[in-house]
Every structure is written in structure tokens, then in C-alpha cells.
Curated annotation (Swiss-Prot):
It comes from Gallus gallus. It comes from the Eukaryota. The chain crosses the membrane at residues 71-89, 284-304. The keyword Mitochondrion applies. GO terms for biological process: mitochondrial cytochrome c oxidase assembly. Belongs to the SURF1 family. This is Surfeit locus protein 1.
Length: 309
């Protein structure tokens, strides 16, 4: 009974204090933002608004929305930052690739060394000039096709042109017995046009005597996408598979490209080595930095200038 009496005495006082706080809030909102009606009862009209504004639930919702906006803002900033880092990484990759191409070009122009039969050493000698002495076995020719003639002078003249007039044909691969080493290797003698593919059409170039030969070491190739499989039965090869070529000819899986000085009248044109390393890093640099610039601009408009996208 004492408790009920206390509540009855305190209840009216608590109710008056609650009404005073609500009235004060309503009057404040009316003065700063909500016009009074002609009847002057802005308190009545804005009561539901003020209650919502003053409620703890509204404050929690606003805080949650602000937190979500912050996460979105800084999360989206990762997009241009990541693109910038990838573009910078591609600059380093391009520098590394250009240095590698320069090293290979320098290796091609170095003095030839005697050919080694050590497989581990051969792996380190790709594009390195070597010299051998021996003779060809023209009865076991192989053909890598289609191929176009590697002609640096023609390529320099046609640089920038939309069309090219390179002649199509094949590279002739011939077993070569090395008299000093006592083994047979594979030699890419060079390019022949289609009309000279058959050996009987170039008998003058089918040299039989023992010769000194200089060429560059080449390793086995992996088949690239969209490149056909080698057709061993028809002697149509599309990439260097040294193990398969050695099995067909009985030679060792050692391959060299004969240099241009090995060319004989009526025979294949030597010097068909092309240093081909993919170097598309400039395209990637432009792509990543372009994406960085575009997304940075959109982020700035959205979160700094507050312009709807």
C-alpha cells in the first residue's frame, strides 16, 4: 500500500516533467524549422515529428546509416588505389621485360662457342651462338609450317603499314651429324617458299660435303593456344617438339637455328631466329592507370562534392 501511495503522489509530477520536455523540444523545432499554423498550434502538428526525432531508435538508425556510408566511402576508395598499384607494378614488369629482351639480343650477337652435349648447360644457352662441324642427312627433313621469312630490312621498311607482303612457306629442319661430337643434332636450315618445299625443287642447295656451321641454340616449345597439333604422319610440324622430332629422325633432342651465313644458293635462307617475348605491359599500364583515373573522379564527385551519380 505504501508503494502504491508513493506512485500516486509521484505520478502527476513525472507526467508534468515529461510533457514539459516534449513541449520544449516541439517549440524548439517549431522556431527553427516548422512554421506555426494560423491557429498557432504548431505543437500539435509537429508532435509526431518531434517524438520520432527525440526517440532513441531514431538516433540509433542515423548512427547506423552514417556507419554504412563510411564503410561504402572508404571501401570504394580501394578500387582506384588497387588500380594505381597494379599500374605501377606493370611499369616495373615492363622494365624487366625490356632488360630481358636486350639481354637476349646481346646474347645473339656474342661470339659462337663450341656446342656442348650437357643437357643442363644447354638449358642456359638458348639464343647463344654455337659452332659445329659435320654434314646433313637430307633424307629425313622435317617441315615447320606455316612460316614467313624473317627479313629485318623488309620489316623495317613496312613498319607502320597496315598490310604486309611477307611470303609464306616453311622452315626446313635437317638432321646434322657432328663429326667432332659423334652425335646427330637437328638444324633449322632456314626458310623456303611453298613452291620450294619438296627437296627435288632445290637440289642445288642440298649440300652433301662436310661443313662448318654456326647457329643459335633453341629449346623445345610448348604448344600455344589455337596452334594445331603436330601431324607426325604427314610431316607437318607447327611448333618445336624436340623429343618427338628426335624420335622420328633418330637424332639427339638438340636444336640450333643456322645463321644467315649458312645460306647456300638454291637452299633454305638461314637466320630465321626471331626473339619473340610477349611485351604487352604498356597496354596494361594504360588500362590500370585509366581505370584509376576514372574511378577516382567518380569517387570524388560522389563522396566529396556530394553529386549524385
Amino acid at each position: 500500500m505504501a508503494t502504491w501511495g508513493l506512485l500516486l503522489r509521484a505520478g502527476p509530477r513525472l507526467l508534468r516533467e515529461r510533457r514539459a520536455r516534449i513541449s520544449h523540444c516541439l517549440l524548439r523545432r517549431t522556431f527553427f524549422g516548422f512554421p506555426r499554423t494560423k491557429a498557432g498550434s504548431a505543437v500539435t502538428q509537429q508532435g509526431d515529428v518531434c517524438l520520432r526525432l527525440c526517440s532513441p531508435r531514431s538516433s540509433t538508425t542515423a548512427t547506423s546509416a552514417a556507419g554504412e556510408d563510411a564503410w561504402l566511402k572508404w571501401g570504394l576508395l580501394l578500387v582506384p588505389l588497387t588500380a594505381f598499384c597494379l599500374g605501377t607494378w606493370q611499369i616495373q614488369r615492363r622494365k624487366w621485360k625490356l632488360d630481358l629482351i636486350a639481354q637476349l639480343a646481346s646474347r645473339l650477337s656474342s661470339e659462337p662457342i663450341p656446342l656442348t652435349l650437357d643437357p643442363m648447360e644447354l638449358k642456359e644457352l638458348e639464343y647463344r651462338p654455337v659452332k659445329v662441324r659435320g654434314h646433313f642427312d637430307h633424307s629425313k627433313e622435317l617441315y615447320i609450317l606455316p612460316r614467313s621469312l624473317v627479313d629485318p630490312e623488309r620489316e623495317a621498311r613496312e613498319a607502320g603499314k597496315l598490310t604486309s607482303h611477307a611470303e609464306n612457306g616453311a622452315n626446313v629442319i635437317t638432321p646434322f651429324y657432328c663429326t667432332e661430337l659423334g652425335v646427330t643434332i637437328l638444324v633449322n636450315r632456314g626458310f623456303v617458299p611453298k613452291k620450294k618445299l619438296k627437296p627435288e625443287t632445290r637440289l642445288k642447295g642440298q649440300i652433301e660435303e662436310e661443313i662448318d656451321l654456326t647457329g643459335v641454340v633453341r629449346l623445345s616449345e610448348k604448344r600455344k593456344p589455337f596452334v594445331p597439333e603436330n601431324n607426325i604422319e604427314k610431316n607437318r610440324w607447327h611448333y618445336r617438339d624436340l623429343e618427338a622430332m628426335a624420335k622420328v629422325t633418330g637424332a639427339e633432342p638438340i636444336f640450333i637455328d643456322a645463321d644467315f651465313r649458312s645460306t647456300v644458293p638454291g637452299g633454305p635462307i638461314g637466320g630465321q631466329t626471331r626473339v619473340s617475348l610477349r611485351n604487352e605491359h604498356m597496354q596494361y599500364i594504360v588500362t590500370w592507370y585509366g581505370l584509376c583515373a576514372a574511378t577516382s573522379f567518380l569517387w570524388y564527385r560522389k563522396f566529396i562534392q556530394k553529386i549524385p551519380l
